[in-house]
């Protein structure tokens, strides 16, 4: 399946002086598949090392991370010739081998001509865990501390990319709707409404996407079988895998807290005020108790954090309130499965009167913006005005209102525009494209068109 990140991988390959690349992303977003395809299509050959499955490689790296000796060992083990620039070396699940992470540093410093890509689903979690344990254990000897430092992140020695679930445009490509995707982009530029029949077709596909989501295996099953039930089965398997990771990559006491926060997300999003409240994870819960658990979920890539900003001035980062935030799932399809949303309700999300469907639309927009590299922030003032998202685009701050259907209101948006003199405002809803009174109407299915400088 065609993925947008391929263009970024090709750009990395062609950039002079590129460093070893770390590709991060939640489990099951397609990292291994896309890297193998990249190796097949853009190199003479490639070698993929699954560090979670090949103990021989891990044992070798414990004793030796000299780049040339690592190359010789991999050539012997996989019976393949590794040539600078012509061979892609893929180190998969690098979070399971801290010495492989350290090796990237030496490749960059001593033999940068070798093209290496490391993929890690829980790398941020693993590195954070190693650093935290090192800080807590004051009795650790100097020799042991030096060994533990092997799991430090090679800052400045690697390039980085993140792969997210497939967005709606990639879903359109996978379902042979490339022409529709192009038409949506064209009308986003012109602000002219699509023909009503095309608009309805696009909304229908959007509603299907709410069920299928963007996890590649779910999309693949849908393309092959058109069975939403099969998609739900795949999603449940992925959710079960996430639960297992919580036990594997965290201490037992922390695991309990992680799962409490994770399981509270549907209830958090069901509230009119979607601010994350620790008390919904456990009665009497506080940031001190659950802060580490939330951080684990964010680092794992399974959730997205949307921070409050109390002002609409540039730079928005200066006005973030890190204690006030919303939490979304990284994939809207997984949200539907986790919340046990009836499939028929999602397939008619635009017309169905249901409060949680508003949260589903909001989650969909959040993951779409994040996949486009946009930081997630929302705004509210001291009164009752609140906007689902605010986006910094160059020298402008753009307010974004999200509605699941055609019933829209502009009270909060007008308040923001008047106070901060925004040149344009975005309203994302089931309405067709349009532009009037400084408000750009963006259909839900066109959220993938929103990009920033």
PLM segments and residue spans:
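Hydrophobic positions on the alpha1 helix immediately C-terminal to the Walker A/P-loop
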Residues: 34, 38
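Conserved lysine of the Walker
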Residues: 31
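Structural recognition of the conserved hydrophobic beta-strand(s) that form the central parallel beta-sheet
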Residues: 90, 115-121, 162, 171
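Short glycine-rich substrate-engagement loop in P-loop NTPases that contacts/grips substrate
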Residues: 53-84
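Interdomain motor-coupling "hinge/lid" segment immediately C-terminal to the ATP-binding subdomain
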Residues: 127-270
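Accessory nucleic acid-recognition modules appended to NTPase machines
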Residues: 219-387, 391
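Conserved catalytic cores of phosphodiester-cleaving nucleases, focusing on short active-site segments
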Residues: 365, 369, 387-406, 425
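Pre-Walker A adenine-sensing motif
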Residues: 2-16
């Amino acid at each position: 399946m065609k993925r947008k990140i391929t263009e970024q991988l090709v750009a990395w390959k062609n950039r002079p002086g590129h460093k070893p690349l770390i590709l991060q992303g939640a489990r099951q977003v397609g990292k291994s598949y896309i890297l193998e395809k990249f190796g097949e299509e853009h190199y003479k050959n490639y070698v993929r090392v699954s560090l979670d499955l090949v103990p021989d490689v891990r044992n070798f790296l414990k004793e030796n991370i000299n780049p040339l000796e690592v190359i010789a060992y991999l050539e012997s083990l996989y019976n393949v010739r590794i040539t600078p620039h012509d061979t892609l070396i893929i180190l998969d699940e690098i979070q399971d081998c801290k010495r492989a992470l350290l090796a990237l540093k030496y490749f960059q410093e001593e033999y940068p001509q070798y093209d290496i890509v490391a993929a890690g689903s829980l790398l941020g979690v693993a590195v954070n865990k190693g650093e935290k344990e090192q800080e807590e254990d004051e009795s650790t000897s100097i020799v042991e501390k030096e060994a533990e430092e092997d799991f430090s992140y090679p800052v400045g020695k690697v390039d980085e990319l993140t792969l997210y679930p497939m967005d709606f445009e990639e879903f359109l490509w996978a379902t042979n709707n490339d022409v529709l995707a192009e038409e949506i982009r064209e009308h986003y530029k012109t602000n002219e409404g699509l023909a009503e029949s095309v608009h309805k077709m696009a909304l229908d596909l959007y509603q299907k996407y709410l069920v299928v989501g963007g996890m590649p295996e779910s999309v693949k099953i849908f393309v092959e079988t058109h069975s939403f039930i099969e998609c739900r089965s795949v999603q449940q398997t992925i959710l079960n895998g996430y639960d297992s990771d919580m036990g594997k990559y965290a201490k037992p006491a922390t695991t309990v807290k992680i799962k409490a926060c994770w399981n509270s997300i549907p209830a958090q999003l069901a509230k009119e005020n979607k601010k994350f409240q620790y008390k919904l994870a456990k009665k009497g819960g506080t940031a001190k108790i659950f802060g580490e658990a939330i951080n684990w979920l964010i680092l794992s890539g399974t959730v997205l954090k949307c921070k409050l900003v109390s002002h609409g001035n540039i730079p928005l980062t200066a006005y973030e309130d890190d204690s006030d935030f919303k939490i979304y799932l990284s994939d809207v399809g997984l949200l539907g499965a986790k919340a046990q949303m009836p499939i028929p309700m999602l397939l008619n999300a635009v017309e169905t009167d249901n409060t949680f469907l508003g949260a589903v639309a909001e989650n969909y927009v959040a993951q779409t913006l994040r996949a486009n590299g946009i930081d997630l922030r929302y705004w509210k003032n001291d009164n009752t005005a609140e906007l689902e998202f605010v986006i910094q685009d160059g020298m402008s701050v753009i307010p974004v209102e999200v509605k699941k259907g055609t019933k829209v209101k502009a009270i909060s948006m007008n308040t923001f525009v008047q106070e901060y003199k925004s040149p344009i405002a975005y309203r994302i809803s089931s309405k067709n494209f349009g532009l009037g009174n400084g408000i750009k109407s963006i259909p839900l299915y066109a959220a993938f068109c929103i990009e920033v400088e």
